[in-house]
A protein has these predicted regions:
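Basic, polyanion-binding surface patches
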Residues: 1-154
Length: 154
């Protein structure tokens, strides 16, 4: 097997929380994508890192100064995760009644919402590393986070 195959199989052993990154682009279009590569960077200033594939529809809407939300999903939101990872169903992503789309789109029933402003972008081969400054955050008191390992939700 190639190093890429071995690396992919090794990474499948990690358990990831599942989130949806959502934003509104400069033309007022709503975007959302399922992401598992979300990491806190610092508490001072509060900041977060997300990796987005350059081929994703949302990619070009992520620019310095733009705003986005990381919606940490709960165990009941597996179907929404699947929907937001399917480029062919992009037009269906905001049909869920729990989306608040007044400003930065966010899921009102998510485990947590982390509202950010893009501070830095770093291109790295197939992906862009997005560094966001956290402007606000809220969370549910009950912890029931949707997780993913070895190609399956748990």
């Amino acid at each position: 097997m190639s190093i890429q195959d071995n690396f992919r199989l090794a990474m499948r052993r990690y358990i990831y929380s599942v989130s949806i990154m959502s934003n509104r682009d400069l033309n007022d279009n709503l975007n959302a994508i399922t992401v598992s590569s979300v990491t806190s960077i610092s508490m001072n200033p509060p900041s977060i890192l997300i990796c987005i594939n350059k081929s994703a529809k949302i990619h070009d809407s992520i620019v310095i100064g733009s705003k986005f939300c990381i919606n940490l999903l709960n165990k009941d939101q597996q179907q929404l995760s699947d929907l937001c990872s399917d480029e062919d169903r992009h037009d269906q992503r905001f049909l869920d009644k729990n989306w608040n789309t007044n400003d930065i789109p966010f899921l009102s029933n998510a485990q947590a919402n982390i509202f950010c402003k893009v501070d830095k972008l770093a291109s790295y081969y197939t992906h862009t590393v997005v560094i966001g400054l956290v402007e606000d955050a809220n969370f549910s008191e009950t912890i029931s986070t949707l997780t993913y390992v070895d190609g399956k939700y748990i």
